[in-house]
């Protein structure tokens, strides 16, 4: 057999393959590569070199010191990384298609039926309250018989997980308060990237999550045994056995900024966008924008997506800053992926270099609906409160709130989507304050930047905070479209930076709204807090059960949703919805002080959701009229 190495670098003048028996070796075996007329460099070695570590030295005529850098193969299927600044890496030769999937296939699900749980692979098991035995995050996540991980996710009833970036990424940023590579780090005392929105390899799973470490080990090679490839598959297979689809959050609009040896060294002129002064464009805010319209860049993205589908059985993808990806690439991704799985899920952030959820919808993509998020919750908890607070944020009004119920369709004023299943309805994501913290601060019951010494007291919801959390959740789960919640939203998780962090964080003890760099209890789910707010957790479970059982909240026709007019109460809303001969009434009172009395259609109605509980088991019945106190919500079903 033979092992063939290829690298596309059309502007390079010389490329050398460097192989290593161990990644620690300072010098390896070097092989001069040959260039073809298409800009592809090639070297062929006799034998099948599985387990071999390798990289490329890429020389350009206009740059010095290129030969000092070992570049990572952009098509590497497994990667080992040395945990220090600049994240030096080596690719590993592995054999694909050797995993026993035990008959596993993709989960094909109508997008309207999706209930997505956005989560970080480590967060669900890293806190001791999860009850998980120390092991790698991939393995810990699927350990049975524990309070956290897959057991907790299954108990909620969600049917899809969306993993924060789990392609190999830049874990380590530049030294704090030091000049490095022309930059000065005055923003990140942790010198870490925990969320992973700095992709280093489009084809390899993140190696950190395959290590049996409680925290990142600095100055150590991780991923040497390529364990991530099998552990990632074990994880996907375990979720599929529970009927839970697996989506990946992927970042193709830029690459890892704080390292050498990536596509910027391989061929920056080909792969990146530049401004008219010759600097990297950074509409992503991450130092470089990937030139997705280049044929070989587009090909790499598409082949990456198809590889994750075929090799790892991934059911769907969420694209970070989707508007930075050119339209032709967006269209080809969906076209090629649907050949493999016609129900593959593609959603995105419809911003970054513009804002165009309608453009994505026209091309068959879903988008995160920031309009429902801001309209219902608000844009910020200080002076941008939304409907649940009895306020109108921006250009919201009762007409727009009604449009959110129907999927924010283009047929309504300021609508965004051609189809309801293109609207990813959410009130919380990894970005910004959690919904629980937004409400804590928005009510004035917790002051921003206050040092929180009693985290249990802070976590425990007041009666008013609980009402607002329930009202928001009820609106979310009864609206047409895709439903997404973020990990811990169901117990109003609070992201308090621990007082005992070992770095110079001036915000320690306060509530965080951008925890991307914290591999600590700020992000880890504390399941004791889920117990503290069990009433809210049970309410979420009941809403999930309700949505899954009754298609009226997922598949009702626009004409089958009929709104009830509430005179002189602008923040009250009601509607009836019919589907398959089953009729419901959904009622909300977001008024701050006023009760609302509503006349019901003729007949007897069972109560499925009241201000205390939610589910599919009737909580009582009612006829003729119903009175809603401020912040009450109800779902009634015709008896």
Where do the PLM segments sit?
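Aromatic- and carboxylate-lined catalytic core of secreted/periplasmic carbohydrate-active enzymes
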Residues: 56, 527-562
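Conserved, mostly hydrophobic/aromatic
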Residues: 7, 56, 119, 163, ...
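Tight coil/turn sites that cap or link beta-strands
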Residues: 430, 603, 612, 629-633
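Substrate-binding/active-site clefts of carbohydrate-active enzymes
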Residues: 75-76, 122-312, 322-341, 345
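Carbohydrate-binding surface patches
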Residues: 3-13, 545, 563-601
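Conserved alpha/beta catalytic core and glycan-binding cleft of carbohydrate-active enzymes
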Residues: 334-504, 553-554, 558, 564-569, ...
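The feature marks proteins involved in alpha-glucan
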Residues: 1, 25, 36-140
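C-terminal beta-strand-rich structural cap/linker in extracellular carbohydrate-active enzymes
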Residues: 9, 51-52, 619-639
């Amino acid at each position: 057999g033979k092992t063939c190495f290829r690298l596309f670098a059309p502007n390079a003048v010389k490329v050398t393959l460097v192989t290593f028996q161990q990644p620690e070796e300072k010098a390896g075996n070097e092989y001069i590569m040959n260039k073809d007329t298409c800009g592809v460099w090639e070297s062929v070695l006799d034998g099948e070199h599985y387990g071999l570590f390798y990289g490329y030295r890429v020389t350009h005529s206009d740059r010095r010191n290129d030969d000092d850098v070992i570049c990572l193969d952009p098509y590497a299927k497994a990667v080992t990384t040395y945990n220090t600044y600049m994240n030096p890496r080596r690719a590993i030769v592995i054999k694909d298609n050797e995993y026993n999937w035990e008959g596993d296939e993709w989960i094909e699900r109508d997008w309207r039926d999706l209930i997505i749980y956005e989560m970080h692979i480590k967060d669900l098991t890293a806190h001791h309250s999860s009850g998980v035995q120390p092991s790698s995050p991939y393995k810990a996540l699927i350990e049975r018989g524990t309070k956290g991980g897959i057991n907790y996710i299954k108990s909620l009833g969600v049917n899809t997980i969306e993993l924060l970036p789990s392609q190999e990424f830049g874990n380590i940023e530049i030294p704090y308060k030091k000049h490095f590579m022309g930059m000065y780090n005055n923003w990140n005392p942790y010198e870490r990237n925990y969320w992973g929105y700095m992709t280093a390899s489009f084809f390899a799973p993140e190696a950190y999550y395959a290590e049996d470490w409680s925290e990142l080990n600095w100055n150590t090679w991780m991923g040497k045994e390529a364990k991530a490839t099998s552990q990632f598959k074990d994880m996907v297979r375990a979720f599929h056995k529970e009927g839970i689809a697996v989506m990946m959050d992927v970042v193709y609009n830029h690459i890892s900024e704080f390292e050498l040896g990536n596509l910027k060294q391989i061929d920056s002129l080909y792969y990146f966008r530049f401004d008219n002064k010759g600097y990297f464009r950074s509409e992503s805010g991450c130092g470089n924008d990937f030139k997705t319209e280049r044929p070989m860049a587009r090909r790499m993205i598409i082949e990456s997506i198809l590889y994750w589908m075929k090799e790892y059985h991934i059911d769907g993808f969420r694209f970070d800053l989707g508007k930075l990806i050119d339209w032709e690439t967006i269209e080809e991704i969906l076209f090629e992926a649907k050949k493999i799985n016609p129900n593959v899920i593609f959603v995105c952030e419809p911003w970054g270099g513009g804002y165009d959820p309608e453009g994505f919808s026209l091309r068959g993509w879903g988008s995160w609906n920031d309009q429902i998020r801001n309209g219902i919750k608000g844009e910020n908890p200080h002076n941008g409160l939304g409907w649940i607070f009895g306020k109108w944020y921006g250009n919201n009004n009762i007409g727009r709130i009604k449009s959110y119920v129907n999927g924010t369709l283009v047929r309504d004023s300021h609508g965004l989507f051609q189809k309801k299943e293109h609207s990813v309805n959410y009130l919380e994501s990894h970005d910004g304050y959690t919904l629980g913290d937004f409400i804590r601060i928005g009510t004035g019951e917790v002051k921003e930047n206050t040092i929180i010494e009693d985290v249990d007291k802070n976590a425990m919801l007041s009666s008013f905070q609980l009402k607002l959390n329930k009202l928001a959740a009820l609106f979310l789960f009864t609206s047409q479209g895709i439903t997404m919640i973020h990990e811990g939203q169901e117990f109003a998780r609070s992201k308090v930076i621990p007082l005992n962090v070992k770095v110079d964080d001036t915000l320690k003890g306060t509530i965080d709204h951008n925890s991307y760099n914290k591999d600590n209890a700020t992000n880890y789910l504390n399941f004791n807090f889920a117990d503290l707010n069990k009433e809210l957790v049970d309410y979420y479970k009941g809403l999930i059960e309700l949505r899954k059982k009754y298609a009226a909240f997922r598949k009702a026709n626009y004409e089958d949703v009929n709104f009830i007019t509430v005179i002189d109460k602008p923040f009250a809303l009601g509607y009836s919805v019919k589907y398959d001969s089953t009729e419901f009434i959904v009622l909300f009172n977001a008024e701050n002080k006023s009760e609302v009395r509503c006349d019901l259609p003729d007949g007897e109605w069972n109560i499925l959701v009241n201000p205390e509980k939610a589910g599919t088991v009737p909580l009582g019945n009612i006829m003729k009229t119903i009175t809603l106190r401020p912040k009450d919500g109800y779902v009634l079903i015709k008896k």
